[in-house]
Amino acid sequence: MVESIAAGQVGDNKHIEMWKIKRLINKLENCKGNGTSMVSLIIPPKEDINKSGKLLVGELSAAQNIKSRITRQSVITAITSTKEKLKLYRQTPTNGLCIYCGVILMEDGKTEKKINFDFEPFRPINQFMYFCGGKFQTEPLTTLLADDDKFGFIIVDGNGALYATLQGNSREILQKITVELPKKHRKGGQSSVRFARLREEKRHNYLRKVAELAGSNFITNDKPNVTGLVLAGNAGFKNELSETDMLDKRLLPIIVSIVDVSYGGENGLNEAITLSADALTNVKFVAEKKLVSKFFEEISLDTGMIVFGVQDTMKALELGAVETILLFEELEITRYVIKNPVKGDTRTLFLNPTQQKDSKYFKDQASGLDMDVISEDQLAEWLCHNYQNYXAQVEFITDKSQEGYQFVKGFGGIGGFLRYKVDMEEALGDVGDGGDDFDPDTDFI
């Protein structure tokens, strides 16, 4: 049996691509070979693909000298499969090329299975790697899982302001401005009152300028161009900026941290990055909590605009009624399409691991005949490849937050927001079996 991932199947949803890579890494790491029968080849962008072809020719020649006949044949098979995959490409794809080929052992330790993966990563891997051994090498793939959310920083004090972004480990200074604000006037009299008024006016104008530049730096096409915004400084300016109505209202919801720093400018930026690290890490969990909390709110208000459980969610999706699918990233539901060998009709089943072991789900209830399995897919993977066909979006949920844990344990780890109300009893009728049933008396926390 040959498994493959078509090269270049890169979608427009970064989080889905990251989820696919995470699943692929887990699969590859669980593969065990019989001897040195597994080849890992990663070619970075702009690398001459013919160079890798020549390398494989040399490796194939060297493999002929392996003394053990079984090992020799396994290595030759793996390298030959890799060569065949490489021939599919005239040049290295834009983001590089990843190929994994080999013969692996199944769980019984005896049965062998042929594995062939070739794909263009959804973003570049700038590292060449060739390895032939008893396991697949996945370290370069883990670089694809690095978070690339972009965060904005405003460092503001009485001397000036700095605007910057942080993306992964890369930071960029967008703009710097300086200001000379008059110091406080210590003497009394009318002049001190006038001076204080002028000073306050200059401070106000400076704050207005800082707010205006925040909008020009962090808003593009009428929406924020960063995931979160950090305000930092060593005086009251940062707090005033967050509270003033001069700051664009579209930026207020994405302020994730306000921190005190000892310096202005780039030194202040370095300090702000360190002090806001926890807040930036929590951004994803905050977004998840908001999404799932909204889901729970719709349930409590009985709006009829959400769906949960595998059967209801998949039926609503089939009807085109689901706008956003909420999906537990480790959902253990398998989608089967089975066919009656006599009547020719098909059914779709959604089974959890326990149900998959029960033969009753694969028999015709009337005749007792065994049904033919037409297809078998992990439901999460099937959704990731097909969600766009139903004009839906997919949002992954973890069980790391309290809300996420409740969604997974209480609602089966799958649900969705609807475009319009659906009478699920009428829509479902006689549907496939399986999945996790939901009991509102015992499951809702």
Swiss-Prot record:
InterPro entries named among the record's database cross-references: eFR1_2_sf, eRF1_1_Pelota, eRF1_1_sf, eRF1_2, eRF1_3, Peptide_chain-rel_eRF1/aRF1, Ribosomal_eL30-like_sf
Swiss-Prot/TrEMBL keywords: Cytoplasm, Protein biosynthesis
Superkingdom: Eukaryota
Binding partners and assembly: Heterodimer of two subunits, one of which binds GTP.
Function: Directs the termination of nascent peptide synthesis (translation) in response to the termination codon UGA. In Stylonchia UAA and UAG codes for glutamine.
Protein name: Eukaryotic peptide chain release factor subunit 1
Family stated for the protein in its record: Belongs to the eukaryotic release factor 1 family.
Metal-binding in keyword set: no
